[in-house]
Amino acid sequence: MIPTRREIVKYYKTITLKDGRKCILRNGEEKDGQAALANFILTHEQTDYLLSYPDENTMTAEQEGRFLQEKTDSDNGVELLAEIDGVVAGLAGFDAVGGREKIRHRADFGLSVDRQYWNLGIGTALMYACIECARAAGYEQIELSVVAENEPAIAMYEKAGFVEFGRNPRGFKSRFTGYQELVYMRKEL
């Protein structure tokens, strides 16, 4: 039987990036609202592979801060920041797929990294941190969807043990490129 209450997961880790810089991975907090929102908007401007467009965001910095604090205090999900020299370089998190008993074992995961920090290992580190947190919270499976053209992300997920379980050829309808195929992936924890 799946527990009705999960563990609240706190995360803090310092890693060394491929270029030698230090990066802190940690739970977002209310004070991070402005920086996290700026990163969210920036990363969503930099690629067409994410779920939303920057102009669809309706959160203020204060609301983003409250969202981050709620996640930090939640037993259903986590929102992590990757911070380099006080700058938010990336965000990643997971949430329960749903609250019903039959799906309570599943978590839905996503991440984004500022393009200037790509290929330094931040995305990989955030992914593994979320896997670790999801496992610690009591989830048994973590899931994601990724645009099929995003081959580097798919390779990263496969290397971590995610397996494809389906595709939706019209999963996204991009303003720029039309329909984008989504690949659905999962990893047992």
Regions found by a protein language model. Give the residues of each.
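Terminal substrate-recognition subdomain of acyl/acetyltransferases
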Residues: 2-19, 168, 175-189
